[in-house]
Amino acid sequence: MLGLSLLLSWGLALTQTPLFGDFMLRVKPAAHDPYDTKFYRKFDRLLAGLLRWRWGVVAGVVALFALSLAVMGLMPQNFFPSLDKPYFRADVLLPEGYNIRDTERNLRLMEEWLHEQPEVKTVSVTMGSTPPRYYLASSSISLRPNFGNILIELHDRKQTEEVENRFNAYVVANCPDVWLRSSLFKLSPVPDAAIEFGFIGDDIDTLRRLTQAAEDIMWRTPGTANIRNSWGNRVPTWLPLYSQMKGQRIGVTRSQMAQGITIATQGYRLGEYREGDQFMPILLKDENIDAYNLTNLQALPIFTPAGKVYSIEQATDGFRFEYRGGVVKRYNRQRVMKAQCDPARGVNTMELFAALRDSVTRAVPLPEGYSMKVFGEQESQQESNSALAEYMPLTMILIFIVLLLLFRNYREPVIILLMIPLIFIGVVLGLAVTGKVFNFFSLLGLLGLVGMNIKNAVVLVEQIGVLRAEGKGPYDALVSATRSRIVPVAMASGTTILGMLPLLFDSMFGAMAATIMGGLLVATLLTVCVLPVVYAIFYNIRES
């Protein structure tokens, strides 16, 4: 969109500007030199001093650039900002092994409390899974009987955090079995946890040991919240030991035995029934499903394709009772167990992640055959940054080629590209003054600043070349071109800065606006002052 807009504006500038200029602008003989003013005389003295102390100017700019990079590393960073909406959502998770009735009971308590709050406008509760996608960046969770989701709308956005904190305190006091994760709406899909360290390997006990060690570090680290793992707790499991010999004798396979257990415990899914836009599962259940317990499970009926019925005891060598993981997750077909946590309210995610990564890497040794991978928001950020950086070298090469075709030598393109680092000085200043954090939109604004600063530099360098071609001396052409381009460059940058002003107070695009405004303001000032110095160094221009 930006590329198309710039292309169209370029075409209009070449056609409409001369047309309207011919109608509306009239050349008047100048009564005096327009540059013979106090401002321009002071600027000439400033520029002469900068050219006289050129190497000191270069050293100062390099020092400012290094300082800005150092400060940038200390500034708070966030991948995607929260949306400025009067909503928050809460994911409710009970321990593995709890059924849908336990989930319903706890959700009803929370719903009743929320309806009693005067700040709450509406409450939407979904049980067993996440609701249909109600906005693009919402994340989905598959069917789980111990999961619920609550969407809360308030009358005023300013009340969101206060009600959210009260709601969290109520759940802790009245629903001790519930794990609750509440969050504001974000522009990007919210992962299972903001910070995740995944341990990959084969042995389940080893994975649990490594994950538990990482969880212990999270508990000891200030600023963490919602600490858990991706597999949840172990659940008591009743295991029938299938006998291949007995099963073959009566015609019962392992899958048929598993199907029989499903029919007698939770129901076997045969298909779906559709009514309007609603889909309801069709389940085959044993009519005695509520009568089975540990004392009579060995009498579960198993049906064969031949229509015969056998008890599960006739196809097994006995039964075993043990604790097993209710959930086993995989990554690239390998078992992965994640230690997960979120930052507490007001704690920067990137800073907390850096502290945890160093501690986990140092304190959790990995056995042979096991590895650790970072997931969560950090993984999403790395993927997005990699996608942006993938074609950056090609982009810079194409920019250099275009500048090379425009000026037909190497020195002018190099001088122009050397102005790009100046934008970092302004970006840091803009974010620091406005109190914004560096996020994904700031990165997009930073990329846009590259083109804006190159445009300003091209205008100045081209004017120097025009004056030199007209026969002016190198030093006079340098000073005159810089003097004459101050107003055009300042007007172009100033209108862009003012155009960003309405976005500065937006929760989503505020950081991008601060990046562009600060970067363009400082880069424009430094370009007008520093580019002539660099040009003079490259062409060895001195005052005659």
Each language-model region and where it sits:
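Transmembrane alpha-helices and their membrane-interface boundaries in multi-pass membrane transporters
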Residues: 1-31, 150, 422, 456, ...
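Alpha-helical membrane-interface segments at transmembrane helix boundaries
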Residues: 1-3, 39-54, 76, 80, ...
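Hydrophobic transmembrane alpha-helices and their membrane-interface caps
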Residues: 4, 398-485, 490-509, 518-522, ...
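Signature of alpha-helical transmembrane segments and their immediate interfacial
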Residues: 32-81, 107, 121
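Transmembrane helices with small-residue packing motifs
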Residues: 62-98, 134, 179, 184, ...
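Short, hydrophobic beta-strand segments
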Residues: 86-96, 137-156, 189-209, 236-248, ...
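Solvent-exposed, membrane-proximal periplasmic/extracellular interface segments of envelope transport
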Residues: 101-190, 216, 245-265
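Extracytoplasmic/periplasmic membrane-proximal domains and adjacent transmembrane bundles
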Residues: 208, 215-395, 399, 404-407, ...
